[in-house]
From Swiss-Prot:
This is tRNA uridine 5-carboxymethylaminomethyl modification enzyme MnmG. PROSITE patterns: GIDA_1, GIDA_2. The keyword Membrane does not apply. Gene3D superfamilies: FAD/NAD(P)-binding domain, GidA associated domain, C-terminal subdomain, tRNA uridine 5-carboxymethylaminomethyl modification enzyme MnmG/GidA. NAD-binding protein involved in the addition of a carboxymethylaminomethyl (cmnm) group at the wobble position (U34) of certain tRNAs, forming tRNA-cmnm(5)s(2)U34. One of its GO terms (biological process) is tRNA methylation. It comes from Streptococcus pyogenes serotype M28 (strain MGAS6180).
Length: 632
């Protein structure tokens, strides 16, 4: 079929949420002429649910996005109202930043960034179809009948894909926050042959700040020392005038109201068909599943400086409006609270992610990429991370350059994508630190050390960032080398000082680095014995030094495991392999291999239901069969 195109682009991104913004900024910054198409320009980078960025695992993803040259970290650093480091009482592997956002300012600031980006056209339009010829993307069709040519298309439609809002007995077609749903595109994605799933998520009511009795709640302030998501943000820019959040709880009266109205709850009446998020359940689901709990935490989170709206985190619900009001008024501090928005549930279509490659390109259609909630994830951060990788790979494909695949040992983003494409997901996927087997080397403090060079190689890290990174890396390397070369000897003067500090005396000579491995010895104490570095070191470099030195043994073990897995990841599996021709593989493994069509032995080994014997048989088969090949 010959198409008459009115406009032509290298890449078209459909949807301007957190995934779409990162995808389009990446492609345009890499030199591709890009169109970012969205149903509503006023909702670009909008936060339809929680007014926050980061959190456990998610905060590390934002740092990874920043290290690669993405935008989310820089944007939240400009627009937050509170910043907090989580899990400070635990090990470095699970520490992560979380920021309360001024949600309207966050969206406005991101829109400004997109509007001034070279090579990037922003258009309010609805895309109804993906145009495909001979198994390859050639463009898109708008609802008004316009055809735009493209060499690659990235679908980042979020919860708008055949979205339906559910509130009590009411159910109607809608995207998030009463925006338009994308119904025709959902139909046409299915017609293209993609397998489609149906998920559900929800959001809590918002209450008016001036109607809250804060005396009945517990204040939750931000940190009083500088912290940032972006490695380029300066401590001098740290916000001192932060806005606190507040903690309250449900109670028995709250639970009674919910239990008495379960017959009206869409979650239990059969109205909701989609699968909801395990790690962010509705309040009615929590009351039923955890009936023994006397109360549940609720955090009152301001949505910005210039609004009275307060987000009631932990109270996600689709109960009828009258029940939501009674529920709110049963809660301490909210007895007279004015509900400004009701909570609701939203159901939406997803593209089942086992159909994707680790580049986030669909296996079925060349040049078609998907990212974000379209792939079955939950959360702004997960969406942004996928959007960045999908955008990078769309640009690399257009330019005929080698693709970028982040491994599980490279980044939490790599863990997430590998989980999605290898295991699929039966519910909205959320990143957790427990999902990462190499979490000690995937830390908040070393994201730039892991990923900045990759960002530079693909063209997303500019000269200013690269110079700052080189300075930091050189300072780190030089100081680590110095600490490993200077020795402390067990002489009387040294041991007298050690004992004065309340520490065990030295029995043998040791390097300053070995001295720092002692749990009680921090960097400041060590340099008080051996003298300071040649130049003043930033606090973040000192933090990195302490972690790398104190956990060196564990880090080395993790890196050994990475090296072993790398050998498996390098063993490619041909795309045209005949799984039925491999004798002795278990039936379940054969079925999973056919469904997922893994690209490497490493990926095959992580598929649920596949055991080591199946992998051994597969490796023997591949060694004796060199005719097959993988081509995309």
């Amino acid at each position: 079929m010959t198409h008459e195109f009115t406009e032509s682009y290298d890449v078209i991104v459909i949807g301007a949420g957190h995934a779409g913004v990162e995808a389009s900024l990446a492609t345009s910054r890499m030199g591709c002429k890009t169109l970012l198409a969205t149903i509503n320009l006023d909702m670009l980078a909008f936060m339809p649910c929680n007014p926050s960025i980061g959190g456990s695992a998610k905060g590390i993803v934002v740092r990874e996005i920043d290290a690669l040259g993405g935008e989310m970290g820089k944007n939240i650093d400009k627009t937050y109202i509170q910043m907090k480091m989580l899990n400070t009482g635990k090990g470095p592997a699970v520490r992560a930043l979380r920021a309360q956002a001024d949600k309207s300012l966050y969206a406005r600031e991101m829109k400004h960034t997109v509007e001034k980006q070279a090579n990037l056209t922003l258009r309010q339009t609805m895309i109804d179809d993906i145009l495909v010829e001979d198994g390859r993307v050639v463009g898109v069709l708008t609802a008004t009948g316009q055809k735009f040519a493209a060499k690659a298309v990235v679908v980042t439609t979020g919860t708008a894909l055949r979205g339906e809002i559910i509130l009590g007995e009411l159910k109607y077609s809608s995207g998030p926050n009463n925006s338009l749903a994308s119904v025709t595109l959902a139909d046409n994605l299915k017609k293209l042959g993609l397998e489609i799933g149906r998920f559900k998520t929800g959001t809590p009511p918002r209450v008016k700040a001036s109607s809250i009795n804060y005396d009945q709640t517990e204040i939750q302030p931000g940190d009083d020392k500088p912290n940032h998501f972006s490695f380029m943000s300066k401590d001098a820019e740290y916000l001192k005038d932060q806005i606190p959040c507040w903690l309250t709880y449900t109670n028995q009266t709250s639970h009674d109201i919910i239990n008495q109205n379960l017959y009206r709850a869409p979650m239990f009446s059969g109205i909701v068909k989609g699968v909801g998020p395990r790690y962010c359940p509705s309040i009615e689901d929590k009351i039923v599943r955890f009936a023994d709990k006397e109360r549940h935490q609720l955090f009152l989170e301001p949505e910005g400086r210039d609004t009275e709206e307060v987000y009631v985190q932990g109270l996600s619900t689709s109960l009828p409006e009258d029940v939501q009001k009674d529920l709110i008024h049963s809660i301490k501090g909210l007895e007279k609270a004015e509900m400004m928005r009701t909570g609701y549930a939203i159901e939406y279509d997803i593209v089942l992610p086992h159909q994707l490659r680790a580049t986030l390109e669909t296996k079925l259609i060349s040049g078609l990429f998907t990212a974000g909630q379209t792939n079955g994830t939950s959360g702004y951060e997960e969406a942004a991370g996928q959007g960045l990788i999908a955008g990078i790979n769309a640009a690399l494909k257009v330019q005929g350059k080698p693709e970028l695949i982040l491994k599980r040992s490279d980044a939490y983003i790599g863990v997430m994508i590998d989980d999605l494409v290898t295991k699929g997901t039966l519910e909205p996927y959320r990143l957790l630190t427990s999902r990462a087997e190499y979490r000690l080397i995937l830390r908040h403090d070393n994201a730039d050390m892991r990923l900045t060079e990759i960002g530079r190689d693909i063209g997303l890290v500019d000269d200013e960032r690269w110079k700052a990174f080189e300075i930091k890396k050189n300072q780190f390397d030089n100081e680590l080398k110095r600490l490993n070369s200077i020795k402390l000897k067990p002489v009387k003067a040294t041991n007298d000082r050690v004992q004065e500090l309340g520490f065990k005396p030295l029995t043998d000579a040791m390097t300053a680095k070995e001295f720092m491995r002692r749990p009680e010895i921090d960097y400041a104490t060590a340099v008080s014995f051996v003298g300071p570095a040649a130049e003043d070191l930033d606090a973040k470099i000192i933090e990195l030094l302490e972690t790398e030195i104190k956990y060196e043994g564990y880090i080395r073990k993790a890196l050994d495991q990475v090296a072993k897995m790398k050998r498996m990841e390098e063993k490619r599996i041909p795309a045209n392999i005949d799984w039925d021709a491999i004798d002795s593989i278990a039936t379940e493994a054969r079925q999973k291999f056919k469904k997922i069509n893994p690209e490497t032995i490493g990926q095959a080994s992580r598929i649920s239901g596949v055991n080591p014997a199946d992998i051994s048989i597969l490796m023997i088969y591949l060694e004796g069969n060199g005719k097959a090949h993988r081509k995309y």
